Amino acid sequence: MTKLIIHLVSDSSVQTAKHAANSALAQFTSIKQKLYHWPMIRNCELLNEVLSKIESKHGIVLYTIADQELRKTLTKFCYELKIPCISVIGKIIKEMSVFSGIEIEKEQNYNYKFDKTYFDTLNAIDYAIRHDDGQMINELSESDIILIGPSRTSKTPTSVFLAYNGLKAANIPYVYNCPFPDFIEKDIDQLVVGLVINPNRLIEIREARLNLLQINENKSYTDFNIVQRECIEVRKICNQRNWPVIDVSTRSIEETAALIMRIYYNRKNKYHK
């Protein structure tokens, strides 16, 4: 199997370069990859340390660096080593500048911008934590999105991912033979999404969870008929109310959240023209 080394160099958290790399790597199933993360590279001394690592471990370099001198040093070094050096957002910034007629700012301000978006994200994260697993149902009216589904269908991580995108998401578990909150009988403005999964896959996940917690008494938790019934009931609840249902059997959390956001914004645009 071909091995590919990728160096992710950033003057910030390296997440932008990491997302770009992972998106590209998803197109290659036969590549074994090794990613080296080099965050907070903001001066020549730190960059030189990274360059020595790149020299010892040749590979593609993906970078997001605002400082012009640091960029020049990095690209020149990679050129001499004859290895690719790619600016993740450089092309985007250039096209924005050309299209808008606004010059690119030469100086980089490393102080994070504490704007409304930042505080909306913090509030959404706090909301997701406080309204996890059916907690504080009386405050559902404050949410943007409500996720329902059987236990271990990725409701919690999906809620957190949505929160990082500024959306307040509550999640409520569906448990076999347990009464579901009466909010489903009311007309609500929030987007409600049901999450289901292949029963066999869900049993595997639940068994792994029980083994991790060293629990071997909860047989109904991994009983196929009960697990299957839980997924069927969630579909039934959603179908009766025209709520969307997402099968997460083969989806990553990011994919599930992205699909939910698409539904949410399509719905928002439809009713708020």
Curated annotation (Swiss-Prot):
Its EC number is 2.7.11.32, 2.7.4.27. Bifunctional serine/threonine kinase and phosphorylase involved in the regulation of the pyruvate, phosphate dikinase (PPDK) by catalyzing its phosphorylation/dephosphorylation. Disulfide bonds: none annotated. ADP binds at G149, P150, S151, R152, T153, S154, K155, T156. It comes from Rickettsia prowazekii (strain Madrid E). This is Putative pyruvate, phosphate dikinase regulatory protein. It is an enzyme of class 2 (transferase). The keyword Nucleotide-binding applies. The keyword Flavoprotein does not apply. One of its GO terms (molecular function) is ADP binding. It catalyses: N(tele)-phospho-L-histidyl/L-threonyl-[pyruvate, phosphate dikinase] + ADP = N(tele)-phospho-L-histidyl/O-phospho-L-threonyl-[pyruvate, phosphate dikinase] + AMP + H(+); N(tele)-phospho-L-histidyl/O-phospho-L-threonyl-[pyruvate, phosphate dikinase] + phosphate + H(+) = N(tele)-phospho-L-histidyl/L-threonyl-[pyruvate, phosphate dikinase] + diphosphate. InterPro entries: Kinase-pyrophosphorylase, P-loop_NTPase, PPDK_reg. Gene3D superfamilies: P-loop containing nucleotide triphosphate hydrolases. Keywords: Kinase, Nucleotide-binding, Serine/threonine-protein kinase, Transferase. PANTHER family: PYRUVATE, PHOSPHATE DIKINASE REGULATORY PROTEIN 1, CHLOROPLASTIC.
